[in-house]
Amino acid sequence: MKSGRFIGVMSGTSLDGVDVVLAAIDETMVAQQASLTWPIPVHLKKGILDICQGQPLTLSQLGQLDTQLGRLFAQAVNALLAQQRLQPRDIVAIGCHGQTVWHEPTGEAPHTLQIGDNNHIVAHTGITVVGDFRRRDIALGGQGAPLVPAFHHALLGHPTEKRMVLNIGGIANLSLLFPGQAVRGYDTGPGNMLMDAWIWRQCAQPYDKDAAWAKEGQVILPLLQKMLRDPYFAASAPKSTGREYFNYGWLERHLAAFPGADARDVQATLAELTAVSIAQQVLLNGGCERLMVCGGGGRNPLVMARLAALLTGIEVSTTDKAGISGDDMEALAFAWLAWRTLAGLPGNLPSVTGATEASVLGAIYPANPITQS
């Protein structure tokens, strides 16, 4: 089995930066050693948002964005190597999720598309890359997402305690870790995505720091109820979603019935939407003893307070309390998935994604032996 140092690279739906994590991994442990977040330039962020919202673009523009993101991911990896004074030969492989620009796992031709050319990452780092993790699961009839519940189970599963792990990124997803039961998990709906989109349009701020703006507003109950009637929330698992569905256009359609709504009230309502839609799914699955939160939403004090209030009797805390950085969880998961791919081990859980079978995931982009030796 391949073991040693791996690097995980994650650029999620929040677009708040490229998370890069260094970890030592083998069959018995995942030990995080270092991490950093690398900024995404404004022009790349705009290009990603345009695609995700269905804006037309040429194949040339898509190809350029693919290349530019691959180079950006390589820069982020090289920055971590320099920070830690490591050489390419010190790293077994990079697990790179890529940037999701479209996710449509149902219909006549299910598909998902992550860009950020892995060939450029190999060329500019000299390290083997494992990427394209989601499409094998979709080819096997699955949703292609979420993939992190398997990692949550490996790190945070407990033999007797009924736990759930909640990742609040752009989209929120829930992992159900119940003793004696198959792991389940799915996307509950919007996490930070709509809150970030609204404050960006209104205030040109990337996110609502400490929920300060939302705290100034009041929840618009009819708007909240209208949004919660979206059929996605009532759909049965397995299910997954993304920015191609819960985007600014989705929000605008719901706001059309509320002309003149105060911008701060809308922000407060979006925070409540995230908390309520998550809490409903926690309770629908019978609750748990401990809800462990990771992702950027774990730093939103309003969302965290509302979850605690809506889920009385459940301990709501971040994964940091368990010794695992909530900010680095997803990048760490893809480092682990790269290890599993190189070890010939399956990376998906059919009980989560709905795939017909467990499978080794991803494609391997080998480094030239002369550079990784």
Curated annotation (Swiss-Prot):
It comes from the Bacteria. Pathway: Amino-sugar metabolism; 1,6-anhydro-N-acetylmuramate degradation; Cell wall biogenesis; peptidoglycan recycling. Its EC number is 2.7.1.170. It is an enzyme of class 2 (transferase). One of its GO terms (biological process) is amino sugar metabolic process. PANTHER family: ANHYDRO-N-ACETYLMURAMIC ACID KINASE. Keywords: ATP-binding, Carbohydrate metabolism, Kinase, Nucleotide-binding, Transferase. It holds the Pfam family AnmK. Catalyzes the specific phosphorylation of 1,6-anhydro-N-acetylmuramic acid (anhMurNAc) with the simultaneous cleavage of the 1,6-anhydro ring, generating MurNAc-6-P. Is required for the utilization of anhMurNAc either imported from the medium or derived from its own cell wall murein, and thus plays a role in cell wall recycling. It comes from Salmonella paratyphi A (strain AKU_12601). This is Anhydro-N-acetylmuramic acid kinase. One of its GO terms (molecular function) is phosphotransferase activity, alcohol group as acceptor. Belongs to the anhydro-N-acetylmuramic acid kinase family. The lineage of its organism: Bacteria, Pseudomonadati, Pseudomonadota, Gammaproteobacteria, Enterobacterales. NCBIfam families: PRK09585.1-1, PRK09585.1-3, PRK09585.3-2. ATP binds at G12, T13, S14, L15, D16, G17, V18, D19. It catalyses: 1,6-anhydro-N-acetyl-beta-muramate + ATP + H2O = N-acetyl-D-muramate 6-phosphate + ADP + H(+).
